[in-house]
C-alpha cells in the first residue's frame, strides 16, 4: 500500500515538473500588471508562417526550466508581428491598418513591430519594469541560449554591460542551470 502511495506521489510530482507551461499574456495585460507588481517583460514576436518560431515554441518555451524561469521572473507576452490586435504603449496606440483577414499566409507588419525595430522572426524583445524596450534578440534560441538572456534581463545585470567585452565576460562567467 505504501509503495502504491509513493508511486502516485512520484507521478504527481513528475506531472507538475513536465507540464510546466509559460503563462502567456497580452502586452496590455503585462503593462497593467507592472503597475501592481513591477517585473520585466519578455515578448516573443512571431508570425504564423515562421518555421523557426514554431520550433522555438516546441523546443524552447516547452522546456520546464525555461517556462518556470519565465513565469517567476517576467511577464511573458506573445505578439503576432502581423496580427490585427490594437495595443497601447507609452501613450501611443499601435495597430495594423494594412491587415487583411483574407491573406492566408503573410500579412502586413503591425505598427508595434515596426516601432520595436523588429525585422526578422522569431525575435525576443525584453522590456524593463516600466515597459521601456531594452533589447531585441533575433533568431531561434535553444533553452541553453535563451537562459543567458533571461538571466541577464531578469534583473538589472544588463545595466553593467557597457561593451561587447563586458558581454563576453558575462557569457564566459555564466553557469547554465537549465536542462536540455
Label for each model-derived stretch:
Residues 20, 117, 128, 134-180:
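Non-globular targeting/processing and membrane-anchoring segments
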Residues 21-24, 63-104:
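Thiol-based oxidoreductase modules, predominantly thioredoxin-like and allied folds used
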Residues 23-41, 70:
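A short beta-strand-turn-helix
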Residues 54-58, 127:
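Detector for the c-type heme attachment site
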Residues 48, 81-84, 130, 142:
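Solvent-exposed coil/turn segments that connect beta secondary-structure elements
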Residues 1-21:
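Bacterial Sec-dependent N-terminal signal peptides
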Residues 37-51, 76:
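Short active-site neighborhood of thiol/selenol oxidoreductases, capturing the structured segment around
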Residues 40, 95-102, 110-125:
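Structural micro-motif
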Amino acid at each position: 500500500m505504501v509503495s502504491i502511495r509513493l508511486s502516485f506521489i512520484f507521478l504527481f510530482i513528475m506531472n507538475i515538473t513536465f507540464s510546466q507551461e509559460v503563462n502567456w499574456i497580452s502586452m496590455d495585460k503585462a503593462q497593467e500588471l507592472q503597475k501592481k507588481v513591477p517585473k520585466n517583460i519578455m515578448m516573443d514576436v512571431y508570425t504564423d508562417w515562421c518555421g523557426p518560431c514554431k520550433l522555438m515554441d516546441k523546443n524552447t518555451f516547452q522546456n520546464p526550466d525555461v517556462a518556470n524561469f519565465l513565469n517567476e521572473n517576467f511577464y511573458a507576452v506573445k505578439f503576432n508581428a502581423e496580427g490585427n490586435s490594437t495595443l497601447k504603449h507609452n501613450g501611443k496606440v499601435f495597430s495594423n491598418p494594412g491587415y487583411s483577414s483574407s491573406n492566408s499566409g503573410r500579412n502586413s507588419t503591425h505598427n508595434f513591430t515596426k516601432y520595436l525595430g523588429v525585422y526578422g522572426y522569431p525575435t525576443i524583445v525584453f522590456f524593463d519594469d516600466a515597459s521601456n524596450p531594452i533589447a531585441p534578440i533575433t533568431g531561434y534560441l535553444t533553452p541553453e541560449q535563451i537562459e543567458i538572456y533571461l538571466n541577464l534581463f531578469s534583473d538589472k545585470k544588463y545595466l553593467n554591460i557597457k561593451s561587447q567585452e563586458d558581454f563576453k565576460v558575462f557569457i564566459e562567467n555564466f553557469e547554465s542551470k537549465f536542462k536540455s
